[in-house]
Amino acid sequence: HPSLLPAFPGADAHSDVLSSQVRVSGCTVHVVDSGMDSGTILGQSRVPVFTGDSRASLAKRVQIEEHRLYPEIIDLICSGHEVVLDD
């Protein structure tokens, strides 16, 4: 998910981040459950939000971290490590 859950769940996280004027965003790998982005968090990575960021520039920065974090979490799970950050 393209935000640091539980902040900014839903389909347009980047726009929500920008309109809130927070200085840090990021991405979350989580278990999918029946709620809205409410599953157990398995990993997160932070990125800065810069003054003047557009939705596209923030999305690109977050996507780079998503592409780094997702395989890292998969590797940890496949090697038998506990990766749950919350319950």
What do these predicted ranges mean?
Residues P2-L85:
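Donor/substrate-binding cores of folate-linked one-carbon enzymes
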